[in-house]
């Protein structure tokens, strides 16, 4: 899968921009741009750009091909988990909805047409290992999101069972905050909270087993869900990508340390060496950090989905 032109920001005249996130640009698709046989309903065009964020700040330098690789990983998992949970993808090709004059090759592998859903206003996080903000919370309180954990656990230790730890859904530039399940219930209601929790853990267990067969540990992951007009629950946005998940090479896993991961760790490590306040604007990245990060995304895509990047 050759990587095409780098895309930092998508501009599609005739498609109203609904949201520009840290990585994805989301456009409403007017009815007259849809194929005549499209089922009734509202649809979105979701574009994965090559933007990179770290510490909740979008950095000025993109990672070439990152959006295509993220989209490929997401699509792989959406199709792989259809038996577990419906997803937001629909059977409408990207080139069918693009405005005239836009090169479809630029968007073919980095964009998808999706159902327009009502987002559940909580990030759904599954954790199988004690790392990241979960490790920090455990050190401080012995708990993660109100869940009591055994004493004496070490950094990166596998948890007795995967746990569901929701968080707030922050705006671009703000920080998500871990919340307990009771707080989620107050936000979305008990019935929906339980459906999201059950789906999150069910998908995590399936994906963790699949990744383990390929020599990769899925330490944790974050999902987003949405509902349609009839209250049906769908998984949406991105799925099990290196941006939303912490993947570790199993052969480099060592208890008590933070294992290397298939993500933007090279970027985070570099930024930690700078005198930077972790607020916008972010600093420029050296070419070697960009290339090493791109290679990590490409390796994750190849090992998980069997798709090679030239």
From Swiss-Prot:
EC code: 6.3.2.6
Keyword Nuclease belongs to the record: no
InterPro entries: SAICAR_synt/ADE2_N, SAICAR_synth, SAICAR_synthetase_CS
GO biological process, one term: 'de novo' IMP biosynthetic process
Single Gene Ontology MF annotation: ATP binding
UniProt-listed SUPFAM superfamilies: SAICAR synthase-like (SSF56104)
GO terms under cellular component: cytoplasm
Keywords, sorted A to Z: ATP-binding, Ligase, Nucleotide-binding, Purine biosynthesis
Pfam families in UniProt: SAICAR_synt
Domain of life, per lineage: Bacteria
Pathway stated in the Swiss-Prot or TrEMBL entry: Purine metabolism; IMP biosynthesis via de novo pathway; 5-amino-1-(5-phospho-D-ribosyl)imidazole-4-carboxamide from 5-amino-1-(5-phospho-D-ribosyl)imidazole-4-carboxylate: step 1/2
Enzymatic reactions: 5-amino-1-(5-phospho-D-ribosyl)imidazole-4-carboxylate + L-aspartate + ATP = (2S)-2-[5-amino-1-(5-phospho-beta-D-ribosyl)imidazole-4-carboxamido]succinate + ADP + phosphate + 2 H(+)
Alphabetized CDD domains for the sequence: SAICAR_synt_Sc
Homology family: Belongs to the SAICAR synthetase family.
Name of protein: Phosphoribosylaminoimidazole-succinocarboxamide synthase
Gene for this chain: purC
């Amino acid at each position: 899968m050759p990587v095409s032109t780098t895309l930092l920001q998508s501009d599609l005249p005739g498609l109203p921009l609904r949201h520009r996130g840290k990585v994805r640009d989301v456009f409403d698709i007017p009815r007259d741009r849809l194929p005549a046989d499209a089922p009734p309903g509202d649809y979105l065009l979701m574009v994965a750009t090559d933007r990179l964020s770290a510490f909740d700040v979008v950095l000025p330098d993109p990672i070439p091909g990152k959006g295509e690789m993220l989209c490929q990983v997401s699509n792989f998992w959406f199709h792989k988990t259809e038996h577990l949970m419906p997803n937001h993808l629909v059977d409408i090709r990207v080139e069918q909805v693009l405005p005239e004059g836009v090169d479809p090759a630029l968007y073919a592998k980095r964009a998808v047409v999706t159902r327009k859903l009502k987002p559940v206003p909580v990030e759904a996080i599954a954790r199988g290992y004690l790392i990241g903000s979960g490790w920090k919370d455990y050190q401080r309180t012995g708990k993660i999101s109100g869940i009591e954990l055994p004493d004496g656990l070490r950094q990166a230790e596998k948890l007795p069972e995967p746990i569901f730890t929701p968080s707030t859904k922050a705006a671009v530039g703000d920080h998500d905050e871990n919340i307990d399940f009771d707080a989620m219930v107050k936000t979305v209601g008990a019935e929906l909270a339980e459906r999201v929790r059950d789906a999150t853990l069910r998908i995590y267990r399936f994906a963790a087993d699949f990744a383990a067969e390929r020599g990769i540990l899925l330490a944790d992951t974050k999902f987003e869900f949405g509902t349609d007009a009839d209250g049906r629950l769908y998984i949406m946005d991105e799925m099990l990508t290196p941006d939303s998940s912490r993947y570790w090479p199993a052969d480099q896993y060592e208890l008590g340390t933070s294992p290397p991961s298939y993500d933007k760790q090279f970027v985070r490590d570099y930024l930690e060496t700078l005198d930077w306040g972790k607020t916008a604007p972010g600093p420029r990245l050296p070419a070697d950090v960009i290339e090493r990060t791109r290679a990590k995304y490409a390796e994750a895509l190849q090992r998980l989905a069997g798709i090679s990047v030239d």
